[in-house]
Amino acid sequence: MRSFLNLNSIPNVAAGNSCSIKLPIGQTYEVIDLRYSGVTPSQIKNVRVELDGRLLSTYKTLNDLILENTRHKRKIKAGVVSFHFVRPEMKGVNVTDLVQQRMFALGTVGLTTCEIKFDIDEAAAGPKLSAIAQKSVGTAPSWLTMRRNFFKQLNNGTTEIADLPRPVGYRIAAIHIKAAGVDAVEFQIDGTKWRDLLKKADNDYILEQYGKAVLDNTYTIDFMLEGDVYQSVLLDQMIQDLRLKIDSTMDEQAEIIVEYMGVWSRNGF
């Protein structure tokens, strides 16, 4: 049975402070709705979801989470942003859609801590924060989405990136390249083109055909356009080279965001 819980008051909410939302252990979390006022989403920085002190997902600012929800056309409302652990865009193959979506719920049975951490910018006018949890019967953490970001320098011309982590047994659902000058991207595995060099306009149109919103200054390689987990890239031990070839019209720093999926463990990725 799904239930709804007003989470405890968030301590240390003030401009310039670091804060943590501590989720009660023993529940399975489907969605966390974070309400905010007196602070902009861009002023809530270095957002980290941690299980037992280990990073699960990170966002440069809370606005990046809003953009993630925008891309999937999830409900967006001013003054609140939602952490969707259950993924409503997923479609079942051998199971129902609901089973597939709930497979990614954040179980906490057996954990010691489960936290959402962030920093509040010193320029925030008068921040106020509260959170509501949508939760269900407790389970241990299993399949989860793990969002990681990396910063790379792009050249005016072609830049090859071949050092993204390849944790064996995990999957890649999507790769996002956030940079204004990205013109086209090719994706290779062990020298084989999985995705040819596609111009951003052509890639954007493909995303739109599958019901995804296109984000400004972002080139998204979505391996699960139909919401099918089996279309994602399985990182097996045979893969020796995973490579992005990025054509850019300027020298700039890019944020590379990789959405990994896999079974969480204390000793895992």
Swiss-Prot record:
GO terms for cellular component: viral capsid, major subunit. It comes from the Viruses. Keywords: Capsid protein, Virion. Signal peptide: none annotated. Gene3D superfamilies: 2.60.120.730. It is found in: Virion. The keyword Cell cycle does not apply. Major capsid protein. Homotrimer. This is Major capsid protein P2. It comes from Pseudoalteromonas phage PM2 (Bacteriophage PM2).
